[in-house]
Amino acid sequence: MNTRAPRPTDLVALVTFDEDVRENLAVTRERLAHGNTAPTPLAAAIEQWLHLGRRTWVSVAGRQIRGIATARELTAKHAWEIDTLIEADDSQSREVLEDLLRQAIVAAENAEVTHLLLRTPEESEAAEVAMRAGFALVQGERLWRGRLQPTSTTANGVREWSDADAFASFQVYCRAVPISARQCMAMTVDEWSAVRDRHWQERSDGALVVEHEGRVVGTARYARATGQFTLTAEPEAQGATDALVTALARRLGDAERHIALVAVSGATEDAALRRAGLEVEPGAYALFCKRLVHPVREESYARAGIPITGG
């Protein structure tokens, strides 16, 4: 078995693999709304050959493809997300998955990538294999789904996000997310910005912040067409979070359903979504990150006088 980038000589095998329906173990935000499909192996390979920004690796045994993985850039070119992870060898599924992930890591190192992300079902074989391949668990995540029916009709303190809110939004992330998760993924504002996923939003979609006593305490992003949104709030900011949910409901009113992927550590967010009528779907997801550089220690922020607290 050989794991490598696809070659033009793999064309016949790629076409055959396209016809084999297998679960994509890499879960992206937009596929939570549209279904967890994946770029076809042939299309992904062509994108790589044409240098269109997608990286592709195949696991080959003889003339047959046993698995495929693809990765795409996030906000920054030096941050990648694995958006396809499919194995088609039931007898060696773990070996195929691990080889694909290790090949992705090698390619990321060669491209001077700093972060390689993977989201997969928590109970999937890929979650176990990711740990063996050197990925660190950032956080567990739950999917909320339904129709937002806020208990409040006011959205006091909520306004549209602007570029000037970037650092304040990063501080909300620092206060809302446990330090163990931040150490795995993003400890600086540059890292936090680099790993943000914008693929699930259209250009016309937006973001919100909510302020309390002159300070930003919650943030959200939303996609009107799919009804999907993110929600991050500081602990104890229940009232402000409810106001943020009210504003989201207004902007997503035309969507057939509303969905949000929220970290399991987000007690404030969970409570607000439950009050607004959303329900948690069965199962959970695990977000992993392979860091290819060491994070900046948080103590350096303290010396610089930047107020960042533990989550």
PLM regions with names:
Residues 57, 80-85, 101-105, 143-145, ...:
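Short, structured motif recognition centered on aromatic/hydrophobic residues
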Residues 183-217, 224-227:
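Non-catalytic interaction/regulatory modules that flank or connect domains
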Residues 16-99, 211-241:
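Conserved donor-binding loop and adjoining core beta-sheet/short helix segment
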Residues 6, 69-70, 119-122, 212, ...:
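Structural motif
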